[in-house]
């Protein structure tokens, strides 16, 4: 390990312990040349969880991206950040539980819409208008009509497994 201060290649480990989360090892090191101390972290290099986009591209699952989309949909709505975090947690668990370590964005979006439909119909419509990518006003009105016709907020489509 090179010293970040003088670039000397040799150091000694002064202290070593697990991080607070238990997912890494924190090591306190001292340079053998300049005697300055610095901290390093050692962790397992994990295979990332992936999402498959509509066009077939794959990218890493980004929890913050999901939360940002939900926050935009729920802006100025009475949906607590706690509920949004719970939805994001469920979406993340849904991706993590996949044996292939990937899920389609359509599956994740459907799961999120199911929750929004229960919590706040306006937020649901906002999210659906972006997620479902309506081609014209008729498609949008059709979705609104379906929403108005459902008396039971739990009456929503189920998530289909990846094939």
UniProtKB/Swiss-Prot annotation:
<dbReference type="InterPro" id="IPR055173">
    <property type="entry name" value="NrdR-like_N"/>
</dbReference>
<dbReference type="GO" id="GO:0008270">
    <property type="term" value="F:zinc ion binding"/>
</dbReference>
<keyword id="KW-0863">Zinc-finger</keyword>
<keyword id="KW-0862">Zinc</keyword>
<feature type="zinc finger region">
    <location>
        <begin position="3"/>
        <end position="34"/>
    </location>
</feature>
<dbReference type="InterPro" id="IPR003796">
    <property type="entry name" value="RNR_NrdR-like"/>
</dbReference>
<dbReference type="GO" id="GO:0003677">
    <property type="term" value="F:DNA binding"/>
</dbReference>
<keyword id="KW-0067">ATP-binding</keyword>
<keyword id="KW-0678">Repressor</keyword>
<feature type="domain" description="ATP-cone">
    <location>
        <begin position="49"/>
        <end position="139"/>
    </location>
</feature>
<dbReference type="GO" id="GO:0045892">
    <property type="term" value="P:negative regulation of DNA-templated transcription"/>
</dbReference>
<keyword id="KW-0805">Transcription regulation</keyword>
<dbReference type="Pfam" id="PF22811">
    <property type="entry name" value="Zn_ribbon_NrdR"/>
</dbReference>
<comment type="function">
    <text>Negatively regulates transcription of bacterial ribonucleotide reductase nrd genes and operons by binding to NrdR-boxes.</text>
</comment>
<comment type="similarity">
    <text>Belongs to the NrdR family.</text>
</comment>
<protein>
    <recommendedName>
        <fullName>Transcriptional repressor NrdR</fullName>
    </recommendedName>
</protein>
<keyword id="KW-0547">Nucleotide-binding</keyword>
<keyword id="KW-0479">Metal-binding</keyword>
<dbReference type="GO" id="GO:0005524">
    <property type="term" value="F:ATP binding"/>
</dbReference>
<keyword id="KW-0804">Transcription</keyword>
<dbReference type="Pfam" id="PF03477">
    <property type="entry name" value="ATP-cone"/>
</dbReference>
<dbReference type="InterPro" id="IPR005144">
    <property type="entry name" value="ATP-cone_dom"/>
</dbReference>
<keyword id="KW-0238">DNA-binding</keyword>
């Amino acid at each position: 390990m090179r010293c970040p201060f003088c670039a000397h290649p040799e150091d000694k480990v002064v202290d070593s312990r697990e991080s607070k989360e238990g997912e890494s090892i924190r090591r306190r090191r001292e340079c053998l040349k300049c005697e300055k101390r610095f901290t390093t972290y050692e962790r397992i290099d994990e295979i990332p969880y992936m999402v498959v986009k509509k066009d077939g591209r794959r990218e890493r699952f980004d929890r913050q991206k999901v939360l940002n989309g939900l926050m935009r949909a729920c802006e100025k709505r009475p949906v607590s950040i706690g509920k949004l975090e719970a939805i994001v947690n469920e979406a993340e668990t849904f991706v993590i539980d996949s044996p292939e370590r990937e899920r389609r964005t359509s599956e994740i979006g459907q799961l999120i819409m199911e929750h929004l439909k229960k919590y706040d119909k306006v937020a649901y419509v906002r999210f659906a208008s972006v997620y479902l990518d309506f081609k014209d006003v008729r498609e949008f009105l059709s979705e609104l009509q379906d929403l108005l016709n459902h008396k039971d907020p739990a009456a929503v489509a189920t998530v289909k497994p990846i094939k």
